[in-house]
Amino acid sequence: MSKITEQVETIIQPVLNDLNFELVEVEFTKEGKDHFLRVSIDKEGGVDLNDCALASEKISEVMDAEDPIQEMYYLDVASPGAERPIKKEKDFQNAITKPVFVSLYAPIEGSKEWLGILQSVDETNIVMEVKEKAKTKQIEIPRNKIAKARHAVMI
């Protein structure tokens, strides 16, 4: 996590708490010549366009007051969607029995990417049920080897 995203999280977390929204993720990226501050929010039952607009307005107010980002940027507040990132311990626990996609820093059993059903989670590992050809198997992945994890839509 970058210093900017850490600062932004610290600034906007109280605002989102007051609105009863969960802060899912903050990203600050440059695309071409433009900078984007992307904030993903959620709440019980999901967020709609009005929730995103309200959060955007309140985040904008506090960001303008605190001004932690020197560059001009576009603020984008959205729901995390069906392929929500899995980052926090709570996210991993909530994903048990659900389809997930995991990208690794280094290959395990010849692959850096795994798609399957999350079976269990502990402090050091996750266990996924994955399909390989026509067979189903369980694979144990050390959590410190996970670059990114997210919910997946399996068809």
Curated annotation (Swiss-Prot):
Pfam families referenced in this protein's UniProt entry, alphabetically: DUF150_C, RimP_N
Q: Which UniProt keywords apply?
A: Cytoplasm, Ribosome biogenesis
Biological-process GO terms, alphabetical: ribosomal small subunit assembly; translation
GO cellular component terms?
A: cytosol
User: Where is it localised?
Assistant: Cytoplasm
The answer to whether UniProt assigns keyword S-adenosyl-L-methionine to this entry is: no
Q: Which InterPro entries match?
A: Ribosome_maturation_RimP (IPR003728), RimP_C (IPR028998), RimP_C_sf (IPR036847), RimP_N (IPR028989), RimP_N_sf (IPR035956)
Primary localization class, coarse? cytoplasm
Between which residues do disulfide bridges form?
none
The domain of life for this entry's organism is Bacteria
SUPFAM superfamilies registered for this protein in UniProt:
YhbC-like, C-terminal domain, YhbC-like, N-terminal domain
Question: Gene3D superfamilies of this UniProt entry?
Answer: Ribosome maturation factor RimP, C-terminal domain, RimP-like superfamily, N-terminal
Q: What family does the entry list?
A: Belongs to the RimP family.
* Function field: Required for maturation of 30S ribosomal subunits.
Per its UniProt record, what PANTHER family does this chain match?
Answer: RIBOSOME MATURATION FACTOR RIMP
Q: What is this protein called?
A: Ribosome maturation factor RimP
* Species this protein is from: Staphylococcus saprophyticus subsp. saprophyticus (strain ATCC 15305 / DSM 20229 / NCIMB 8711 / NCTC 7292 / S-41)
